[in-house]
Swiss-Prot record:
The keyword Methyltransferase does not apply. Residues 128-266, 369-570 are annotated as: Disordered. Disulfide bonds: none annotated. Its main location: membrane. This is Cytadherence high molecular weight protein 1. It comes from Mycoplasma genitalium (strain ATCC 33530 / DSM 19775 / NCTC 10195 / G37) (Mycoplasmoides genitalium). The lineage of its organism: Bacteria, Bacillati, Mycoplasmatota, Mycoplasmoidales, Mycoplasmoidaceae. Residues 389-400, 445-458 have a biased composition (Low complexity). Keywords: Cell membrane, Cell projection, Coiled coil, Cytadherence, Membrane, Virulence. It is found in: Cell projection, Attachment organelle membrane. Component of the cytoskeleton-like structure which stabilizes the shape of the wall-less Mycoplasma. This cytoskeleton-like network of accessory proteins containing HMW proteins 1 to 5 allows the proper anchoring of cytadhesin proteins in the mycoplasmal membrane at the attachment organelle.
Length: 1139
């Protein structure tokens, strides 16, 4: 029985069949298939999946089931993101937290339930804050490796600068940082009962506003810098049951105040006076941004805690020098006996000084009584959040942008110490300050100080570390291991109120001006930029109630003036005098570059401050005889017992001069000459920008005076014998007349004075003469000192005087004095202002002077062994220059040969590819043309049959005619395309032929140049000994051979080899091998010498003078290991296309 065709060839679409239907279900689901964490799945742009594994040793991504390597930059993950191969973390990373009540709890079924989740190894708790124990709210039980997330909105931006490992978790919104949920046993009473006396109040408990901070905990409970665990505020409350004052404790989720950021003082202001108790300050505050409105409302409605002050403090807290300055002091080493003192005097003294953690003992002689608390007045502006402060007795140091500044990393920058080596001072400097908010600081904060005395306005400024401008700031310090400055007490600046200012008082505790800085901290207790755990200022106040000194806390980013670097000298002037005390100096300064125009305007209007400098120096610094010079001094050895006076004063704004690791020395009348360390002293002329310098070191000293007279002095400790060296000038050529009495004895004193009266010589001749004289003096003293300074003297009656005096260590000192009748800058020794032409002429003159020295020795009949190939003619330099030039030329030629070959091959390849494409396209067009032609023939026949059938219904003549027209259009279009392609093919073929011709011409030119280089190098190898040996007798017998004659002989010698082939040159070299001629050439290999002569058959003969490659720029970066790559030239031959 025959089978049906359809049953045999059954049409089935196997492509749509599931794989399970073909191979069966390979996975039955009974056994667990373990996923390999080392294998990932990635997808390409088309959605194709790939298995990816990573080889850690080779750094290659590959197919774990094959040998294929992948580029993961072209792959994506399942979400369409760029693929990243992250190895799976260990599964039991978080199992170690199971059972920890901080991460969850067990339910009634005994199953562990997490109270949050981990995100990037950071624990994020979703559990609402509940009062569990005394340490509620603190993460003291968290292990150190668990990192806390940043707060979102409840931290009020205070912990933005904390490191990630100590970030506080999110706090609950309805807690607002207060102790509403504290346990009953540590709850504080809401109303104020009778407050104890001020002494007991300060001694037993901290202030209520900052209550809850552990700033001044004892050292044994001090928390480390980056440890998460810290004592809770509840423990702090429990430890002080004696206090009945209404205390406000912030929630544990709020960040603790660090060294650099104002914490809660932006919202609650302290005001401690001498004779009144501390009371909370009520503030007008509406709709505060951090949710303090409810608390403030409670404060306003509480009649029992109304402030007794007569004035109010504003909520903007621009003043950081209110009664309690928002500054925190780190522990200071007990070995530090002296600390830098900054004290201020005001009409009232409304502050309590914060003491050091370790050295916290207060001198019993100075325990002022708390007398009166000034009135605090607060006002809050909702619209522009610009707050004002009225404190006649306080100095403002906060800005209206301080809230933003707390989030800035600049507030956590390292402190710049007042002195780099923990300098201290023995006397205090009194400030009488008044200031206004300044809004143009670069770091976005208003730094101001206010005082009713209107005596001084001084602001610490943040400067750039490289170009730190000077500031008018008067400080006095006694640096360790440096020159000590004795400053006597000033009788003019008197404090407005009595204030303890004893040396012992300030020696044992930190002063308020410098409070908050870690200048004197030992290295082991230095805090990093971002410190979490800071002791509470409240505990600090509790331990030290005796102090009433007004405290200043400068911003952490503000550098302090140091003695080593130009720091604040443009705004604060140093005046360390022996018999005068420092006084603030006012300065005229407009439009200063760091935004101090407003401050300087206030200083200009201040009439009470007068500069203490006796003389005023203009900004051009033309006169070095003035008392004050804008200069800086390097550290001086401790052995230097003399005292140095630093003083400066300016009529107009001085131009700030940038120093690059260079310090300048003060021209001081009271300071003896220091010769142990080289010091550079520079001054900048603002008008004509001519820089004059004084150099002082162990060898040379250049000083500028008022006359056009140059005096060079070298000293020796032995007796002095004057010696005069006459010099004559003949045809711009200097000849020395030998002096017979030139015997120099080191045991005897010698002072040589050479006076040169320049009558008819120009400035260049005198400059050359100066160098000659210095060299002559050095040669006479067997020294090797060479000066390269150029002295320009334009007057004919200028006088040059050279005094040489050698020191005990046989090192001569050269002092050059230019005494000019004209202004100094016209005849001064300028630094880095000489032209290249003057330098080259001076070098040539020095070379000639060496030649004349040899001539003088030869004339004296001395046998000079230095008369040789190199000493007279300096042929070694010539040979080395020739070698280097040839190396560079060869290097360039080789690179250029490779470059043109590469360009040619690229163009040739592209044109050949285009030719192949056009040929293939024409073949396809020919096929289309033939098909269209056949179709047209069929359509014509069909139309003829239609016409022959009398237009039967089955035929449609109209459609046949339209199809015939379309076929004709297709034929014409294809024919035009074929014609255009043929034209392109013909043009490309012509271009290829022309390209080949031009390339061959370029290769011939390059080979010709290589041939010239090879032959020239051969000449350079052979010309050394044969030529010079033949002329050496004439050199020694007849004297000097003119350089022009030497060059002519060299050229004549080389011309004899112009037409010699390479084989003949090799034979010549072989014949002269017995003469020990060195034919080896450094930097070249044998490939360069062994050039195939067949390649150079088409090249014409040449001479040394016809090198036409001097315009080529050498390329020193290429490798010329294979100079001639003949295979590269051969590989770029003709081509053929079959079409």
């Amino acid at each position: 029985m025959a089978k049906n065709k359809q049953s045999v060839f059954e049409e089935k679409n196997y492509t749509q069949t599931e794989p399970e239907n073909i191979f069966g279900d390979l996975y039955d689901g009974k056994s667990t298939v373990e996923e390999d964490p080392n294998i990932k799945v990635a997808y390409d742009a088309d959605g194709n999946g790939y298995y990816i594994a990573f080889n850690k040793e080779t750094g290659v991504y590959y197919d774990p089931y094959g040998d294929t390597e992948y580029d993961i930059s072209q792959l994506f993950d399942e979400n369409g993101n760029p693929f990243v191969f992250d190895e799976k973390q260990e599964e039991n990373d978080y199992l170690k937290y199971v059972g920890n009540p901080d991460y969850g709890s067990y339910d009634e079924n005994g199953e562990w339930v997490w109270s949050g989740y981990f995100e990037n190894d950071q624990w994020i708790s979703t559990k609402e804050s509940q009062p569990t124990d005394e340490n509620y709210g603190f993460d003291s039980d968290l292990p150190p490796e668990v990192k806390q997330p940043e707060s979102v909105e409840d931290n009020y931006g205070f912990d933005n600068d904390l490191p990630p490992e100590v970030k506080q978790p999110e706090s609950v919104e309805d807690n607002y940082g207060f102790d509403n949920d504290l346990p009953p046993e540590v709850k504080q009473p809401e109303s104020v009962v009778d407050q104890p006396s001020s002494d007991d109040y300060f001694a037993k408990q901290p202030t209520d506003e900052n209550y809850g901070f552990d700033n001044d905990l004892p050292p044994e409970v001090k928390q480390p810098e980056s440890v998460v665990d810290q004592p809770s505020s509840d423990d702090h409350f429990a430890k002080q049951p004696e206090s009945t004052t209404d205390s406000y404790s912030f929630d544990s989720d709020l960040p603790q105040p660090t060294l650099d950021q104002p914490s809660l003082d932006d919202h609650v202001q302290y005001n401690f006076d001498h004779h009144e108790e501390l009371k909370p300050v009520a503030e007008e505050q509406n709709n505060y941004q951090v949710g303090f409105d409810q608390v403030q409302a409670n404060l306003d409605n509480n009649e029992e805690i109304q402030p007794t002050a007569e004035k109010k403090v504003t909520t903007d807290f621009e003043s950081k020098q209110a009664q309690v300055v928002d500054s925190y002091q780190l522990p200071i080493d007990t070995d530090q006996q002296d600390q830098t003192t900054f004290s201020s005097s005001f009409e009232t003294q409304p502050t309590v000084e914060q003491f050091d953690q370790v050295n916290s003992e207060v001198n019993d002689q100075f325990k002022p009584e708390i007398t009166k608390e000034p009135v605090l007045e607060s006002s809050f502006n909702k619209q522009d959040v610009v707050e004002t402060s009225d404190l006649n007795s306080e100095s403002n140091l906060y800005s209206e942008n301080n809230k933003d500044a707390t989030n800035n990393d600049s507030l956590n920058s390292e402190f710049i110490q007042l002195n780099s080596n923990s300098e201290t001072a023995s006397d205090d400097v009194h400030y009488e300050s008044k200031s206004e908010p300044i809004h143009d600081y670069k770091f976005g904060s208003d730094l101001s100080q206010s005082n009713s005395n209107n005596s001084l306005e001084s602001e610490p400024v943040k400067f750039n570390s490289e170009t730190a401008p000077d500031a008018h700031f008067e400080s006095q310090s006694e640096p360790v291991d440096q020159v000590q400055y004795d400053i006597y007490q000033n009788e003019e600046l008197k404090p407005t109120l009595d204030q303890p200012s004893s040396d012992d008082y300030f020696a044992k505790q930190p002063t308020d001006e410098n409070y908050g800085f870690d200048n004197d901290l030992p290295p082991e207790v230095k805090q990093p930029e971002s410190v979490v755990d800071q002791p509470s200022s409240d505990d600090h106040f509790a331990k030290q109630p005796e102090s009433t000194t007004d405290s200043y806390s400068f911003d952490s980013d503000l550098p302090q003036p140091t003695l080593d670097q130009p720091s604040l000298d443009d705004h604060v002037q140093y005046n360390f005098d022996h018999h005068e005390e420092l006084k603030p100096v006012a300065e005229e300064q407009n439009n200063y570059q760091v935004g101090f125009d407003q401050v300087q305007a206030n200083l200009d209007n201040n009439e009470e401050i007068q500069p203490t400098a006796e003389k005023e120096v203009t900004t051009d610094f033309e006169s070095k005889q003035a008392q004050v010079v804008d200069s800086y001094q390097l550290p001086i050895d401790t052995d230097q017992q003399d005292q140095t006076t630093f003083s400066s004063s300016f009529e107009t704004q001085p131009t700030v001069e940038q120093f690059d690791q260079v310090n300048s020395e003060v021209n001081d009348q009271f300071k003896p000459e220091i010769t142990k360390e080289p010091v550079l002293e520079s001054s900048f002329n603002k008008q004509d920008v001519v820089e004059t310098s004084n150099y002082t070191n162990n060898l040379q000293k250049f000083d500028i005076q008022s006359d056009n007279k140059i005096t060079i002095t070298t000293k020796k400790s032995s007796p002095q014998i004057p010696t005069t060296l006459p010099i004559s000038f003949v045809s711009n050529r200097i000849e020395y007349k030998p002096v017979e009495t030139l015997a120099l004895d080191n045991k005897e004193s010698q002072q040589e004075q050479i006076t040169i009266n320049s009558i008819t010589e120009d400035s260049k001749t005198l400059a050359k003469t100066l160098s000659v004289q210095l060299q002559q003096i050095n040669s006479l003293n067997n020294q090797s000192i060479v000066t390269s300074e150029s002295v320009r003297l334009d007057k004919k009656d200028d006088q040059l005087t050279i005094n040489t005096v050698n020191s005990e260590d046989q090192q001569p000192k050269i002092e050059v004095f230019v005494k000019a009748k004209e202004p100094v800058e016209e005849h001064s020794i300028t630094q880095n202002k000489q032209s290249v032409e003057d330098k080259s002429e001076l070098d040539n003159f020095n070379k000639k002077s060496d030649l004349y020295k040899i001539i003088s020795e030869l004339k004296r009949g001395e046998l000079n062994p230095t008369i040789n190939f190199d000493a007279i003619f300096q042929m070694n330099d010539y040979q080395m220059s020739v070698k280097q030039s040839f190396i560079h030329l060869n290097d360039f030629v080789t690179n250029y040969k490779n470059q043109i070959s590469e360009r040619y091959l690229i163009i040739k390849k592209e044109l050949q590819s285009e030719l192949s494409r056009l040929i293939d396209q024409n073949e396809n067009l020919n096929v289309q043309f033939n098909n269209a032609k056949n179709l047209t023939t069929l359509q014509k026949e069909e139309m003829i049959r239609s016409l022959a059938s009398d237009f039967a219904i089955a035929y449609k003549p109209s459609n046949s005619y339209e199809q015939l027209q379309k076929s004709g259009e297709i034929m014409r279009h294809v024919q035009r395309a074929i014609t255009e392609n043929e034209k392109k093919i013909e043009s490309i073929q012509g271009s290829l032929k022309q390209l080949k011709t031009v390339y061959n011409s370029c290769c011939e030119t390059i080979m010709n140049n290589i041939n010239k280089l090879d032959n020239t190098l051969r000449f350079a190898k052979k010309e050394k000994d044969p030529l010079l040996l033949s002329n050496f007798d004439s050199v020694t017998d007849n004297g000097l051979v003119e350089p022009n004659q030497l060059m002519d002989d060299l050229i004549d010698f080389s011309n004899t080899f112009d037409n010699i082939s390479n084989e003949q040159l090799d034979d010549f070299i072989y014949e002269n091998m017995d003469r020990n001629i060195d034919f080896e050439f450094e930097g070249f290999n044998n490939d360069f010498v062994d050039i195939d002569a067949k390649v150079m058959d088409s090249m014409s003969a040449f001479s040394v003078n016809d090198l036409d490659i001097e315009t080529l720029v050498p390329d020193r970066t290429s490798n010329f290991s294979s100079l001639l790559d003949e295979d590269l030239f051969e590989s770029s031959g003709d081509f053929s296309l079959d079409y």
